[in-house]
Amino acid sequence: MLNIIVFVLVIVADQISKNLLFNNLYLGQSVPVIPRIFHITMVYNTGIAFGLFKNQTVLFSAISFFVIVLIIFSILEQKRRKDINHLEIFALYLILSGAIGNLIDRFRFGYVIDFLDFRVWPVFNIADSAITIGMVLILIRCIRLFFK
């Protein structure tokens, strides 16, 4: 149940924050929250996470859709097995919610809205954060299995 709640909250928070910024900031506008450390900066990202590989919207939409289907099958397979790993399922739900959040943007706008700007890293969004956290959790799981 927690997985579903987090899944829904990530998508809702991601979309609400992007809509709020889309309606109140213009492209390139940067609002300091903590000057020189953290800004809200409106960026239209036609690439993937953190602005990599720009102007490939159709390709990344197709890849995102494929990844979403793959993750759903992975979650269903995990739940079918008797040795369920809750950390892995939680991580997959995080990645799934982030992928869906960004795919919604690609369908609506043809790009992803990024806005979290820590000034030393490319601008990103809540969906990117969920994907990254999910991947880190899977990496932790893999390291644990490796050293077991």
Residue ranges and their predicted role:
Residues 1-148:
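Alpha-helical transmembrane bundles and membrane-interface segments of multipass inner-membrane proteins
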